[in-house]
Amino acid sequence: MALKKAPKLFKTFFHWKLWKFSIIVFVFLVFLFLLQREVGVQDFKDEAGIEPVVGKKSHVLGLVLNAMNNIKGAKPKMQIKAPIRQTKVPGERHCLPGHYTPVELKPFLDRPLQDPNAPGASGKAFKTINLNSEEQKEKQAGEEKHCFNAFASDRISLHRDLGPDTRPPECIEQKFKRCPPLPTTSIIIVFHNEAWSTLLRTVHSVMYTSPAILLKEIILVDDASVDEYLHDKLDEYVKQFQIVKVVRQKERKGLITARLLGASVATGETLTFLDAHCECFYGWLEPLLARIAENPVAVVSPDIASIDLNTFEFSKPSPYGHSHNRGNFDWSLSFGWESLPKHENKRRKDETYPIRTPTFAGGLFSISKDYFEYIGSYDEEMEIWGGENIEMSFRVWQCGGQLEIMPCSVVGHVFRSKSPHTFPKGTQVITRNQVRLAEVWMDEYKEIFYRRNTEAAKIVKQKTFGDISKRIDLRQRLQCKNFTWYLSNVYPEAYVPDLNPLFSGYLKNIGNRMCLDVGENNHGGKPLIMYSCHGLGGNQKELCLHASKGPVQLRECTYKGQKTFAVGEEQWLHQKDQTLYNEALHMCLTGNGEHPSLASCNPSDPFQKWIFGQND
């Protein structure tokens, strides 16, 4: 009897085990479906969203585990644990390991093939020679209007390429990590009565060289242009590119306000500002955005190449690298360039390393949008243009950020010898802007600037530089460092004049009643001249009076700041008898003749007597 029932019992037991196994599989599949749905729909954009999601997952897991463990006799028992999630940094996006591939960094648009013999092809010069009378008139009109050869630009393709990638090998071979991911960017281009060809070549250049996954949009900000072709015609042209938008200021407010308008409508994670007459070289964008991903408080500029204003030849980078420059400032608060100090060259291992710069030109740079807003964007009370780049340079460094130049990022720019634009209220707005930055950021060192610029001193005395209380509050809120810290830590090479000098101002000769003057286009290495005293200041080149047996010359000062010394030829004694005595050559300065020179000291000679006078 027992033997007859055995097959039936075995069959019943087998069905029971199969039933339990089916339940296990079903419950496990339900668990996977719920878990996948939770992961798929939840976008981990901020830390606040992590806890509820993890809680939901834990609840689902608990139900599943309890159900499975309550099924007695199920073998083997299954132990399921939720995957351990790594701690998430606020603001960090989900990213994959490894590096971006060339396919992932494919440009937004493919550049059309060009005729290698076309005007300006491959970035070559287009020389306008043998023009007929009509062409000559057109060329002259373009130069007068735009201060560059618009005739040449108009005949160069909007789509021209720049030939082979001639950057150093480490730039061409540079890989970019997927984690943290490269941020998206909004390109902001401000224009006012810009030439059609230079503006549109800038736009096309961006689209042909910027990865599609990084290029969020191109925002063209019209600062009240009056040229008709920049209105409906421009709007119609950019309709073919959904990524390009035009916003307009109804009245001329200048670069600063226009950039703030562009930033206010931008949706990218970073902002990239370009001028309206640029061309971007291969791989220009990735190094800028990679540096911001690595250091969100870095404000980064490309290596700016020159586009010749006459021929539009693009000065391409060298594959062997080259000596770089960085930004500086003088005590007239003008921007300039200088070669890198030895310690900065030593710090950098190759061309992929950023260059730290005390100031930046301010026309071409990228910055995190969040950081741009946090650090105070631009001073909204500054007018039109001028001084905003020096102000931002001081502010970024003093408030915990840093300015850098990325040599592997190359952007060409048409450098003009003068501006084609007039400014409402004239150039006084620039001086007013400079006074605002000096009052907020320079502490006691602002007095050096006021001694150099009589117009600035008047603005301060009359208190016509506007309300700066918001900018002072910003400095206090961000707990920014003082200007002494900036000079000591960011720019120790700067020449800092005495805060309380024994003498300052113009240097007037008693004999001819004329003043010592730099003269035109004297950037060092040329003699000085005697010129009618005007008391306007200007021409402050941070150069030194260098004694020699012929006419004395202006030369680059051997005194460079801390731990440096001036050579004897640049050390002068203003003696009680009003002579200027050079100890190295034991001679005195005379103003007799076309150029000041040295002569045997004669205290009775009125041409050897000099007095300092304050600028009016």
UniProtKB/Swiss-Prot annotation:
Record's GO cellular component terms: Golgi cisterna membrane
Membrane topology value: Single-pass type II membrane protein
Q: Give the reaction(s) catalysed.
A: L-seryl-[protein] + UDP-N-acetyl-alpha-D-galactosamine = a 3-O-[N-acetyl-alpha-D-galactosaminyl]-L-seryl-[protein] + UDP + H(+); L-threonyl-[protein] + UDP-N-acetyl-alpha-D-galactosamine = a 3-O-[N-acetyl-alpha-D-galactosaminyl]-L-threonyl-[protein] + UDP + H(+)
Ranges for region Catalytic subdomain B: 354-416
Give the disulfide map.
Answer: C515-C533, C588-C601
Q: Which Gene3D superfamilies match?
A: 2.80.10.50, Spore Coat Polysaccharide Biosynthesis Protein SpsA, Chain A
GO biological process terms, alphabetically, are:
protein O-linked glycosylation via threonine
**Superkingdom as given in the UniProt entry:** Eukaryota
Q: Which GO terms describe its molecular function?
A: carbohydrate binding; manganese ion binding; polypeptide N-acetylgalactosaminyltransferase activity
Q: Which residues are glycosylated?
A: N482
* UniProt keyword annotation of Glycoprotein present: yes
Listed A to Z, the keywords are: Disulfide bond, Glycoprotein, Glycosyltransferase, Golgi apparatus, Lectin, Manganese, Membrane, Metal-binding, Signal-anchor, Transferase, Transmembrane, Transmembrane helix
| Predominant place of localization | Golgi
- Metabolic or biological pathway, per its Swiss-Prot or TrEMBL entry: Protein modification; protein glycosylation
Segment Catalytic subdomain A: which positions?
A: 182-291
- Residues that coordinate or bind Mn(2+): D275, H277, H413
Q: Where in the cell is it found?
A: Golgi apparatus, Golgi stack membrane
Give the EC number(s) listed in the UniProt record: 2.4.1.41
Q: Explain the purpose of this protein.
A: Catalyzes the initial reaction in O-linked oligosaccharide biosynthesis, the transfer of an N-acetyl-D-galactosamine residue to a serine or threonine residue on the protein receptor. Glycosylates FGF23.
Q: What is known of its domains?
A: There are two conserved domains in the glycosyltransferase region: the N-terminal domain (domain A, also called GT1 motif), which is probably involved in manganese coordination and substrate binding and the C-terminal domain (domain B, also called Gal/GalNAc-T motif), which is probably involved in catalytic reaction and UDP-Gal binding. The ricin B-type lectin domain binds to GalNAc and contributes to the glycopeptide specificity. Essential for glycosylation of FGF23.
Say which family it is in. Belongs to the glycosyltransferase 2 family. GalNAc-T subfamily.
**What is the name attached to this protein's record?**
Polypeptide N-acetylgalactosaminyltransferase 3
Q: Which organism is it from?
A: Taeniopygia guttata (Zebra finch)
Q: Which gene carries the instructions for this protein?
A: GALNT3
